[in-house]
Amino acid sequence: VVLSHLVAFYGIKLAPEPDYPPPKNSEWAWLVTGYSECIDSFFAFGLFALAKQSGFFPAELVETFEPVIQEEARHILFFANWVAWHRRNLSWWRRIAFEARVLGVWAFLIWERIGIARGIDADGEVQDANFAMTGGSAVTGDDLSPRLLIELCLGENERRMAGYDRRLLRPTTVPFLARIARRLLGRPKAPTTGTGEMR
């Protein structure tokens, strides 16, 4: 509803939504949707905080979108707990097949994200679609290092998940991969002035 009002207010012309036929494999489609949302929400948390801190979003817009962002947190929280519940109710041999399917989903999503980062759409056309980095730079007006973006997203993810019942499982795969990426990126060198003092 919020997005539809913004689109209407600014007169943005959008292509009509195509028909979405039922998926041939509902479990695969559900897993792709759920894990994809875990990835997107993780970065959305950080970018939203960045927009808020930088003043790129006015207070009224932050207030409008805050419930939307928090709803994303509830979505991925629900998905993580559904996956755990589903695993527990599978027989051992069905669980093996399920884990193989989950690995296949992650392989598909990683490949898809590589294409997005390179700016290539589903039709093979080159696009400026590296949203996490270009979006972050657009918000701050400066180049945003991958490490700083990851640290911000990790902090915001922990903050948003902290308010829920501790008995609920949290999504862990994306934060785990983000911490590995942060370690591989190494610590940034602190800039110094001519006097040796940190800026």
Region locations from a protein language model:
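Non-heme di-metal
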Residues: 1-199
